[in-house]
Amino acid sequence: MDRKTRRANFKNLQPRLTRSTKAAADTLSLSNFFATPENAEEVPSCLADIPVQPDPPAPKIKPIRTSNVFEKPGPKPKKAPKLKASTVSTSSGARRGRGKSKQQPSISNFLRNEQIFAEVTAQHCMADNFSADDIEMALALSKSESEKHGRLRLHDDDDAVVDLLDDEEKSTERIRHKLQKYGFRTAAKEDYKSLAVLPVVASKGGRRGKWANRFTSLTLRNPDVQQKKLEEKVSALLGQEMRGKEPNGEDCCLTPYTVITAALKELRAEGESRILREPSEGPIDDLESYYVTDLFEVSRTPAHHLLKNWAAIQGRDFSPERETQKCRQLRQQHELVYAELERYYGDPQKLEEEVMQELDELEKLVADNMIEDDSVVINIVEAESSSTGSSPSKEPPDKRPKMTMEDKENLQPTTSKASLTVPAQSTRCTSPDLFADSEDEPDIVTTAISNEPEDVRNLSMKVYKNVSISERSSSVAEIEIVSSNDEPSQITTYEVFSSDEVKTVSNATQEKISFDDDFIDLTQEFDMVEFNESKPRTPNLIASSETDSNVDNLNGDTILDFSSQEVSCPISKELYAKYAKVETFPVWNAAAEEEDKIEFSLSMERDLKSSEQSSHQLGILTTPNDTEHSSSFSELNFSRNSLRRSVSLSTDLSFKSPLNWKMNSSAEKRVSPAASPYKQSDASVDLTQNSDDENDAILLSDEEINYSIWKGNKTVKDLDIGDDSSDSCFASPVTKKRAIPQFQTEEDLDAFLMDFSTDGNGSQGSHSPNKSALSKERAEFGILDAAPSQPFSLSELQSHADKEKSSDNEINWAEASFLDAPAKPLSRRSSHKFNELLAKISKPAHNSGDDFDEFDQMVFQSTKEAASSAGETSDMPQGLDLLLKGEIKTTAIPETRAPGNQTPIEPQQVDVDGNVYSVRVCHTPKPDFATLPESEILQQLYKYGIKPLKRKQAVKMLEFIYNQTHPIMKTAAVQDLPARSEPIVRSKSTPVIMERPHSQVAKSTSKTLKAIGTKKDLTFNDATGEELLRFSQSLAPSLCDDFETFVMQTNVTKKTPQPLVPLHIAWHNLICANPQLHESVLTYEPIDLQAVYLHLKHMGHRYDPKDLKTFFDRRCIIFRYELGAPGKQAERHVRRHTKKPSKRK
């Protein structure tokens, strides 16, 4: 079977619709098409491979051809357009032809026609250097012309639209003629043979490949030619020299605007104040001259002032506060106080005289109080100080690890830091350097040695301290060993140990145990058995500790030192004879051998309530020696203020209570009360002591310790070792403690305070010259002096007329730490235990005459006015808004008034369980929430912005809110109290303020405070700033809590003109500017959430309402907001109701 027969058979096997039409391969070439003679009867068509029919339906196919010849290929049709069936006779030939005619021309034939014409056109364009855009425009114009005048203008053959492959009349010349008509320069037939290799689209059955590479006249451009044209146009544009017109002088000088309104004429700039700037003058040097600076004060506050973490909010600022007159005045007072302190303590001669006076008093106190049972226990106060390295203010005490029992038992003997040269004689007892740093110790040692005379340098002091300490924090252990010499100089050495290091240094003379050089070796540490048996004549430093692992109470008194008998001693021999029983030790016999272990012990205060205490007792046991020696107490090592203070650490297991100072000077034993110049400022009010402490003594708060730490940082850099040894009167945490047993009861303390108040007036002249400034400085650290010139006593609470006469004795209570934010980093918390002072003082009966406590005395100008206006409101104390405005005077010299203008009304004092309370009566009784009707309960809940609850829950909630705002003290036994239901006591956070002229506000109000739930009372806009709260520049502790998550604004765009403020800072500023809003938050009144949101939005701070709700909920701030209109909700519900039946139908 040959090929033709096989192909015919295959064609017969195909279905009629899918049978491929006859398409000669030679007709696909353009050269064969043009080579076809014109008079040929049958011309193979490139557009449609329609088989030859007797009468082909030319008019029906021609519109498809003419409409697709010059059109761009559109999207691929899913199916080819169907042609109408021709109505011919049903003969076999006709039926066969009709079957053939159903096969429409393939769309690829139309595309091939367009492709061929595009290729021809592109070839001619390249040959004749025509623009392809011009050819496309000519084709479009020709098509539009044909559509305008009809489908074909057949009467004019010259203007007929070109149809390349129309019928048998067309020939090669006709094609060439048509091409010439459009402006093409035709060539010979042989030139078109290169077009025979056109890219024939091979249909591989894929949809993508079927329509790939369908070129048109626009896509067949030469990219190199187009790039060349583009470069030419760009170079032509760049080559043009565009020179602008030089501006004239009149054009540069822009005339200022003409001010029309009378209000703006005041701001019109004069001719000499105008800034005329030429553009050619260069960059602007001073940009500030172009801005207005006299309208408001420009603040230079750093941007991160109010932020907890500046890295959390990058590039954002906050609303800074200007430095007020009050802050400026406080800063100047601080500078004056610091300068005064430096000038006062820099005078060594004056300090030497004061120390000599103290030594006389010291002998009397030692003789009366230190001798008990012929024994002295020598203790070392290892007071906890917050020093780590060179900065003593880095680690709070509550973060320190505890000292375990193993640490106390494993005290390894090490050697001292260095061997110091000390003077041979000392005639005075100077106060030690309380702020020495361990890092500065070598420099201090070398300086001290170099400053000593030659006869002093040959003396070498043996190492006196050899203890390896690994305690819960950095401990400053201080021991002074002073020999005698003619010069009144002294060297004090310190070792500062942190919790993670143990200092170990070498000493060459450690093994030398002798007393030839007038030294006592305290570096040897032995067990008691070994001490008693093998080395009976060696004084030792024995560390004895009780059986508790938590060292929470380290008590120490003094260090007793042995020195030579020949040198002079500041303590008399009679006093010495009381302690040592013998003046010399010429020969030690068996009786002396038995009495050699005499313990010198001091009675120490013990916290009897807590069993979890232990103390390090370093007992010096006198042992025989071959050389004659007299054990004289050449150094009792009291600092100047240790006569009246002692250090005690709380026995709390968690070590949360800070380091406190105790007042421990008995009035009966003091011989010369005016000897010390510092007893005026030593009685300090304790803000940190718990009420259940049984050590009834006045304790010092941790703010004073912060002051001493600050003083140590300041003095250790400026002064030398001689000046540092006698430091400020507010000495440091490292202070010796002297326990006095007479202070175990309240009566002894009251008697001491009474005696102290009578002695205080005689010793005013020895105090610092600037008493008022000194008290202010201490007040900045949270230290509230009872009085700058005398201790707090009964006379201060009784004689108000005397206090008004002398303004120098006034205390500026407004600068106290409970009225202002803490100013120092270690002010961890302000305690509410201010009434511990009143627990030691009982007030007379004539003071209990009214219902007006100290809190109202601080707030109101006149006590009569306050008493008359106290019944106007029962919601909150009168005048609280004035207190929140911060208008309490802070001037050092208050306004004085005649005492006859008003008679002070004293609040009633009640002594309950040793505590003195001021009582006032709330004029509205407490409602019985359990018996209230439902309507009133719902009204009360709505008042506080609480949703309706069940009755049981609502009663509990209302009871809680009422108890928080109305604290009540139930008294067991009340003396001298009229018939009242229950005395109402001030809250523990309320400060006790005595009647003083300067601590009263200048004006009082009779306006009843209202809830600000309504918009008319919520006045946010305060243009004059009268309502603005004046806080200090320090960070408010509650501004940003630990759980704070920064709530940022939602209008964060690139075009936001103002800085983005976090929500907690914006809320803080809003609270400061609106005292009524502040009061509403404090009194559980609901705030209008919508008003706050709109006000912040008006200021440019837009927050998400959900973030606002979360923010207020986390702070327990009650808010109220209006829901949507109920009419819209009902209407929406009705619409839904009407739609549902329609759907069911």
Swiss-Prot record:
GO terms for biological process, alphabetical: DNA repair; DNA replication; homologous recombination; meiotic chromosome segregation; oocyte fate determination; reciprocal meiotic recombination; resolution of meiotic recombination intermediates
A single cellular component GO annotation: Slx1-Slx4 complex
Main location per the UniProt record: nucleus
Domain of life (superkingdom): Eukaryota
Keywords from the named record: Coiled coil, DNA damage, DNA recombination, DNA repair, Nucleus
Entries under InterPro entries matching the protein: Structure-sp_endonuc_su_Slx4
Region listing for Disordered, in residue ranges: 48-108, 382-442, 613-634, 666-689
Coiled-coil parts of chain: 321-372
Key word DNA damage present: yes
Biased composition (Basic and acidic residues): 395-410
Feature: compositional bias, Low complexity: 382-393
Polar residues bias (residue ranges): 411-430, 613-633, 678-689
Pfam families referenced in this protein's UniProt entry, alphabetically: Slx4 (PF09494)
Compartments where located: Nucleus
PANTHER family named in the record: BTB POZ DOMAIN CONTAINING 12 (PTHR21541), STRUCTURE-SPECIFIC ENDONUCLEASE SUBUNIT SLX4 (PTHR21541:SF3)
Oligomer and partners: Forms a heterodimer with SLX1. Interacts with mei-9; catalytic subunit of the MEI-9-ERCC1 endonuclease.
Function: Regulatory subunit that interacts with and increases the activity of different structure-specific endonucleases. Has several distinct roles in protecting genome stability by resolving diverse forms of deleterious DNA structures originating from replication and recombination intermediates and from DNA damage. Component of the SLX1-SLX4 structure-specific endonuclease that resolves DNA secondary structures generated during DNA repair and recombination. Has endonuclease activity towards branched DNA substrates, introducing single-strand cuts in duplex DNA close to junctions with ss-DNA.
Family: Belongs to the SLX4 family.
Name listed for the protein in its UniProt record: Structure-specific endonuclease subunit SLX4
Protein source organism: Drosophila melanogaster (Fruit fly)
Gene name for this UniProt entry: mus312
